[in-house]
């Protein structure tokens, strides 16, 4: 029997009642409609890289979305160098980024190395090194589970926010019958259109560490291919590029989002805590800094996790919770709760987990 541990980068999760593997838009639609007709819960999985599942059986349907064929295609190109590109939901995200550069296009190179699929990118509004995918998304083709229609969602309808979207926020809202949406939300992504630029130069480099490595000032542009290779090097150094032989990469990536606090709450943080403007009256701080300064450094683990531990923070990056080889969903959940409690006790800040959860409520 297929388990969620087989489908997630954390490699934890219980058995699946109904497992369906799809590799076309039509088969994806058919599987989702059948699952909704059955009355059970639905989980659509791409790379499984932003998912934490409990060890309990999932009494519903899991739809495992595979690549649809070609990585992407150019839909339209304007005289100013603006290029519209379409990629199917099952396309591996990093293969898409590589494809854009091989076709002389820039705009998503700073998002190199992020695991998962194109279909998941707008749901989470994936981001890294000063950029978010929302900056380049022109529209999303999605199946509306409420109306049964395929529709195209514009950015205004997608409601992008920090590591969030209207699709993600629909989870838990009233859904079919008397059941809330979840674990997959109201809309199932079928394809994504991106507005990119035909240029050898990257989007402006906005992340200080990346700018230093590239030898440019923040806000300047650099060779797009060099940005990609540098980002991949940085991510590897933090255990953020999937490697089956490296347990530091058996994770869901950055597990907690950076807290966005009212100015008054941010003012109570220690003087050394990072602070970034996040809109009127709001301040963003660093989850990694809070975790580290709450006594949860690299490699932190609970005593009951064993020796060597079955689950710990990455030895390279405190934001990643990792499976050291034989962890269960309960082990990862316990570690996450312990880190949250320590940060709250130290700073009065409640960290928000980023991954989609199955059978776990915070």
Where are these regions (language model features)?
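Residues at alpha-helix termini
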Residues: 37, 102, 293, 345-346
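Weak global preference for isoleucine
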Residues: 16, 71-75, 114, 137, ...
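Anion-binding (especially nucleotide phosphate/pyrophosphate-binding) glycine-rich loop
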Residues: 1-147
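Phosphate/pyrophosphate- and phosphate-bearing ligand-binding catalytic cores of soluble enzymes
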Residues: 5-9, 47, 51, 150-330, ...
